Amino acid sequence: MARFRSVFALSALALAASALAACTPAVSSSAPRDPFASPIVPGQSARASAGGGRATIDAPSPRSGSGTVTVALVGGAQLPTETAQAFTEATGFTVAVVSIDGVGSLPKTSADVVLGLDGADAVAASAAGTIASTAPRDTSTLAGTAVEGAAAAIAYGRDDVCVIADKSWLSANGRSLPTSFGDLTSPRVRSLLVVPDPTSSSVGRAFVQEAAAQTGEGLGAFAQSLSPRIDPSLGAAVGVWTAGGHVSQGYVGQLVGGEAEASGAYPLVVAPRSLAAAAATNTGADSYGAPVSSTCIARILYAAATASPASDGAESLIAWLQGERAQRLLATAGSAYPIDGGVAADTKAAWLMGISGDAVVPDETVASPEAITAWLATWNSALSAPASTQPEGEDGDEPAAPSPAPVVTRPSAPDPGTDTEDED
């Protein structure tokens, strides 16, 4: 009887095991051994992690060769080390990088190619003869990205210029996140903003263009009410941002005037959207910085050779940047939103840069040089004679600004370190 019970029990176990196997999916051989070894991020999937979405640009193959390609990065553009190494592995060319804040400095670089031009930069550089006059070989000009008057400019990404807010600082100090240009001049927000000098920085100039578009003839009055701190470069501006210490060293290292782990007393900074990706939290799924969308100006990133005919290395890099591998690497690092939106899924660019919809939009920086000159003159004139402002706390029952209060500087701002005695 005991033997019968034992045989019956074993048979029952075998039947149960067979039933369980029939209703339990097999574990994929590609599944991670420890599913919690990597941070959980929104929308993460095995397919996306393995290679991302399908590319949509019909990019030609870049040519191979040897030698060094000197790359000028303008307007906060990034070419991460991993991306440069991948280019070298694919083509044989090595890369040397030099950073500049505006296209006016391009002739000093002896660069073979420039990355990070926006439409206004491309037009100005083409008129000055500092980029090639013809399009490079082996590249594709995507519909909607051609820049009239700058045939050499080839789109490879997007990185709008916005006001980037330090969410933690605003929350800790009882301030609301600005939602419009008008909010920037409110008593509890004005004088909290730092802007890279628009006369020398492409990023600062783009911000003035958006301010002019939103305020029209009121640009001067807006600038007076805003009363921002002006720093000589994007790197210096990021260095006095209250969340500056959270920005990755790789990002800061490719900014003019950048200083790793530097932070200051200004919770609002004018910068590219990619700054939010560079200030990601440890999870990689959130950021210390939030782009204020209503302040953004759409900015396409262009690459251009600096000479005609372009060197093989320059044309190879431009062609490679349009390929799926490069587009995915830029998006993964959050260095740019890929112009090929099909590869953006499950990347820092998709999670943190705040861009939705089509990647290709009209470049809003494109304007006549005369208009840009007039806007900058109005801006600088207004800041040289700022309007008087009432002390904070007079707009109702709201308290005055907490210490430290930023010290406002003018377009000819002194060394950004001069205000550090007010920073706790």
Protein language model regions, located:
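Periplasmic solute-binding protein
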Residues: 119-128, 149-176, 206-214, 298-304
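A bilobed periplasmic-binding-protein/Venus flytrap-type ligand-binding module shared by bacterial periplasmic
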Residues: 164-171, 298-313, 320-321, 329-333
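C-terminal capping/gating helix-and-loop segments adjacent to ligand/active sites or protein-protein/ligand interfaces
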Residues: 328-407
